Structures are given as structure tokens and as C-alpha cells.
Swiss-Prot record:
GO terms for cellular component: cytoplasm. Keywords: Activator, Cytoplasm, DNA-binding, Fatty acid metabolism, Lipid metabolism, Repressor, Transcription, Transcription regulation. CDD domains: WHTH_GntR. Residues 34-53 bind DNA. InterPro entries: FA-response_TF_FadR (IPR014178), FadR_C (IPR028374), TF_FadR/GntR_C (IPR008920), Tscrpt_reg_HTH_GntR (IPR000524), WH-like_DNA-bd_sf (IPR036388), WH_DNA-bd_sf (IPR036390). It comes from Salmonella arizonae (strain ATCC BAA-731 / CDC346-86 / RSK2980). This is Fatty acid metabolism regulator protein. Residues 6-74 form the HTH gntR-type domain. SMART domains: HTH_GNTR (SM00345).
Amino acid sequence: MLIKAQSPAGFAEEYIIESIWNNRFPPGTILPAERELSELIGVTRTTLREVLQRLARDGWLTIQHGKPTKVNNFWETSGLNILETLARLDHESVPQLIDNLLSVRTNISTIFIRTALRQHPDKAQEVLATAHEVADHADAFAELDYNIFRGLAFASGNPIYGLILNGMKGLYTRIGRHYFANPEARSLALGFYHKLSSLCEQGAHDQVYETVRRYGHDSGEIWHRMQKNLPGDLAIQGR
């Protein structure tokens, strides 16, 4: 097990997560006692206790007073905040994980973008106008793209969509920095933002669904061509 962590707490967290992932601590089983586990990992019990509480909040474990700590099936108990961790744990599955992430983004954005443009056009236009001054490089576009989708999610009037985008942020922006290094991707995105702005101005809300689906398809084709050179830094860094 190769762990790159910058602190005892970070090391303990990665050790436990990787042990769960590799079935050293399988879902449904009980973690070793606190004293045994702290000695096994090489950290103080105080540090271990803090790590266990954090992992419980993220859905990896269930802690109940007076009972042993139980390992969860994280697919059933965790949230979007573990996406980057999953990317680090299973490099071979990263392309599929990213495909699933982008598919979810397209599917939900057809709903919240249409709602934003129809019910809150001024807010939607304010969000889309931020594309007018973006610098022509990958980092700027990655931040812009995330902020536009997130901004339109909140502009829809349903903050739950915004919270979903918040949960995607880490892996989403890492993907974006790689994807938007391609000038074709930046050009396609600008065209998409401009099209949405035009539809908003015209009140053509019925065209939003197809516009978003088309962008998802076209950007997906660019992304699939780029996957052969997928960088290793999509995984989260050690704490």
C-alpha cells in the first residue's frame, strides 16, 4: 500500500480508506479496536479518533456510542464529496467515473438551465455574461465553466441543484483543467454560452434541452479523444 500523506491524520485517513477499498476492512465488518488500530497505523489515539469522526461524516464508517465502529458500503452511504478519493483509489476506472460524472451534469443541467432561463432570465444572463471576459487558457476556462453551471443551477431557484454542483467541484475542475487545454474545447464552450444567452434573450426556452444535450454530446467527443493522455493529477493529493 503506497500512501502519500503530509500529516499523521492524513496518513491514517488514507490507510483506512484504502483498507476499506481493498477489502482489508470489508463493508459490513467491524474495525479493529481503537488501541489496536492506532498501533497498527502508527498514530496517537487522539489523532485516530479525529480521523474516524471525519470518515464517519463522509459515510465510510458508522460510529455509535458504546458499540464497535462499523465499515459501511460507501456506495450507499457516502456523497459526491468522495469523487476525488475514488479517482485516486482506482486509476483504471477514472475514465468511466468521469463519463458518469459528465453524464449526470448533462442530465440535470437540461432541467435547471431551462428553469433558470425561463423563470429568472436576468440572473441567468448575469451568469452567462461572465464568459465575455475570460482569459484564453485552461485554468480560467475550467473555473468559468464550473461557475457558469453552478451559477445557473442556483439561478433556477432550486438550491439543491447548486449543492449537487458543489459536491462535484473538486473532480469537475480537475477534469476541466485538462479538457480546456484543448482550444477546440474552449471554442465550443464559448459558443454554448453564447447560444444560451441568445435563447434567454429570445425567450426560446423550448430549445434549451436540445442545446444542452448537443453540447454534452459534442464536448463528450472531444473529451474521449483526449482520454489517451489523461493526467495522473486528477487524483486528490495526500493531506
